[in-house]
Amino acid sequence: MKKNFIVLLLLLGGVLTACTNNEENSAEEDNSWQNVEEEGQLTVATSGTLYPSSFYNDDNELVGYDVDVAKEVADRLDVDIEFEEYNVDGQISSLQNENTDFAANDFSLNSDREENFLLSSPIKYSFASLIVREEDDSGIASLEDLEGKKAAGEPNTSYMRAAEQYGAELVTYDNATNEQYLTDVANGRTDTVVNDYYLQKMTTEALPDVPVKILDDVYFNLDHNGFLFDKEHEALHEKVNEVLAEMKDDGTLKEISEEYFDADVSEKPDVENIEQVDVE
């Protein structure tokens, strides 16, 4: 009798353990896509000031490459989309606080980001370049010449860290417009803006009266860009990546990119002499 009682306790213990494990698994279940589907809406963090990835057009509509790709993703998932605007740090915080579903703002998909976020498949390939004054190249002919120069940008970006590694003095901005960045370089408040080549190309072409240019043949870090997701939101991450794969295969990414960049940025660029810089 005693032996049977012990066996019964062991069996009950096994049942209780199984129930506990099931409850824990249920508590840890990823409902990120289910929540979006039930709410019928994606909430996306962006800046609204980064031409041509996220900006307001003449009709005061939020548009841009990243914005339009995100809109197409929502359309194919059959949900609405709402954008919340922050600077880069604010976008990161909104993900960490789960106030937004993903961030769309030309984010570099680098190893540092991978430690803290889930990264989408790339929607854009590019490399880094420098905007300088038209009259004198801001005294810069190579990355080594950044030492002592004033580099403009938002804090905590890989571009600013690269400039700092070469000895530049960092001048930080809070979600400033492209025009302000370029004007400050032109009038000598800063010496350079280190950022994405295609963004800089479109910005300088959009503001031809500001006497700045992209420094010739000083390019570094072939990069790929995309969306950032909370580390725990694997279900939503997977769902969006499925749609991005469809958009690449059917040519939609190419079509949207050519509208904003006059180039197919969904494929790796054919550019030589791109230096590799390890950004700490």
Where are these regions (language model features)?
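Extended ligand-binding regions for polar small-molecule ligands
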Residues: 20-22, 67-76, 226-265
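Acidic, polar ligand-binding/catalytic clefts
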Residues: 71, 80-145
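C-terminal motif of bacterial Sec signal peptides marking the signal peptidase cleavage site
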Residues: 15-18
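Periplasmic-binding protein-like
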Residues: 48, 125-132, 206-242, 263-280
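Short helix-initiation/N-cap motifs at beta->coil->alpha
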Residues: 83-93, 138, 156, 172-187
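A ligand-binding cleft/hinge motif common to bilobed small-molecule-binding domains
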Residues: 93, 107-115, 162-165, 187, ...
